[in-house]
Curated annotation (Swiss-Prot):
Limits of the EF-hand domain: 12-47, 58-93, 105-140, 149-184, 197-232, 240-276
Sequence positions that bind Ca(2+) 2: D118, D120, S122, E129
Keyword Acetylation in annotation: no
Residues involved in Ca(2+) 4 binding: D210, S212, T214, E221
Residues binding Ca(2+) 1, per UniProt: D71, S73, D75, H77, E82
GO molecular function list: calcium ion binding
Full protein name: Secretagogin
Domain of life: Eukaryota
Organism: Sus scrofa
Residue sites binding Ca(2+) 3 per the record: D162, N164, D166, R168, D173
Length: 276
């Protein structure tokens, strides 16, 4: 925890903090403006049960404490982690912010995680499967946690990220938890360039998804490519949809039926002729 960050005596949980944060950062930029601080602290203190009679005084004190401890950037942006550590315990802080510290580089990495924890291949992550994910996450970061706390944090994560409140997480919910980087394919415009440029772009695209460097896309590499490709035309796809699109792609591209997509097979699917 930042040494300049001294938590207040009264604490929120991660779900409570997230609920307030979203009011001010609705489009999830990851920061709020300095001019919003008073209103933000007012919401926090209201949630913590502060008496109206001392509200303004406490908001002022809290703002002074915060401004003394933090060097607000010239653009007036205040990051979520700067405020979270004032109101959350260390574990709750970690739960909310670990995704900002370790964002995923590619959809292939994301799909490896999705396939591992969607153990029953239902196309959703259940609370029990999310609990397994969090257990591994805490172990990976060398943080000890009891089973009781783990269950509590699983409930917190479901509260924060289960958008439609159906008791399970879909592909998009997990992508939000893991702070997946921007779709790799967005940088390419395959319909607006020459054949040579398309070939060059194809080489870059294939190299990006062929993480294992085998010359063929398989398993989560196919998943990652399908996810990014479909999200170019359909911004939000479910795990069930992804499996359908994956099956269609393999049916069309996997000429030798080995369950993989060779480089030459994908080129053929995209109408390109490449050197062997």
């Amino acid at each position: 925890m930042d040494s300049a960050c001294k938590p207040t005596q009264r604490r929120l949980d991660a779900a409570g903090f997230w609920q307030i944060w979203q009011r001010f950062d609705a489009d999830e930029k990851g920061y709020i403006e300095e001019k919003e601080l008073d209103a933000f602290f007012h919401h926090v203190l209201t949630k913590l049960g502060t008496d109206d009679a001392v509200m303004e005084e406490n908001v002022w004190k809290m703002k002074q404490q915060f401004m003394a401890a933090h060097d607000v950037s010239k653009d007036g942006h205040i990051q979520m982690k700067e405020l979270a550590c004032l109101f959350l315990s260390e574990d709750e802080n970690f739960l909310l912010l670990f995704r900002q510290e370790t964002p995923l580089d590619s959809s292939v990495e994301f799909m490896q995680i999705w396939r591992k924890y969607d153990a029953d291949s239902s196309g959703f992550i259940s609370a029990a499967e999310l609990c397994n994910f969090l257990r591994d996450l805490f172990l990976h970061h060398k943080k000890a946690i009891s089973e009781a706390k783990l269950e509590e944090y699983t409930g917190t994560m479901m509260k924060i990220f289960d958008k439609n409140k159906d008791g399970r997480l879909d592909l998009n919910d997990l992508a939000r938890i893991l702070a997946l980087q921007e779709n790799f394919l967005l940088q390419f415009k395959m319909d607006a360039c020459s054949t040579e440029e398309r070939k060059r772009d194809f080489e870059k695209i294939f190299a990006h998804y062929d993480v294992s460097k085998t010359g063929a896309l398989e398993g989560p590499e196919v998943d990652g490519f399908v996810k990014d490709m479909m999200e170019l035309v359909q911004p939000s796809i479910s795990g069930v949809d992804l499996d359908k699109f994956r099956e269609i792609l393999l049916r069309h591209c996997d000429v030798n039926k080995d369950g993989k997509i060779q480089k030459s097979e994908l080129a053929l699917c995209l109408g390109l002729k490449i050197n062997p």
